[in-house]
């Protein structure tokens, strides 16, 4: 039994919706994923999944943009069989043979076995390699040997927590960005205090590294509080940080994020308000600071 249980929750909707479209637009030659988890999962109809992928699929029926999205098409087909496609499967299906290779990192061997099994059962799949190790150091070590046409999907929970060698996933983003590679980094937080501390840390690190051209999108539950956790649908707020992407991709990220806010306007998670609001850490964008007591 693989221990990863966050599949199909609301943050996955934002992350995977954007990932599929970005990969289709950018068409990388090499795909690298830092925290892969599994390629495919059996759905269990938890309240968190109902608030996540089930709500999205139901509401997307009324939105032509989402109906035409790769994420909707791939998940709608898979969910008919009771399965959710994780990011490794989505990446393989979107990229197909148009990519030279996909590199998947995870600390859990069972997750990597799941990815390899999924790839073997596909009629068309790109060449893949799996790495059962700490992906922070593993990817940092690989970066100099990877082409500029590489795309990194950096998907931890804590992006600024150092590993045993003092390296963080933010270091991975900065290193890859400086090599000219395209990056999509996901992060999460549970309180407004956590968000503000993370935003400050990320902004300062990027500024220090000389990285000023980046896109950011955050979706946050209106139920979030300043310093207390009132509920746990998987995560109360999450963000996507993108570097070296085309303007088309950057615009899509903002557009899709705001459309998600609209389809979640009447959502509920258990007895809590499940509606979302949009924010960003990028001071060049229109920042909305919201008060939560």
PLM features: residue spans?
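Class I S-adenosyl-L-methionine-dependent methyltransferase catalytic core
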Residues: 1-293
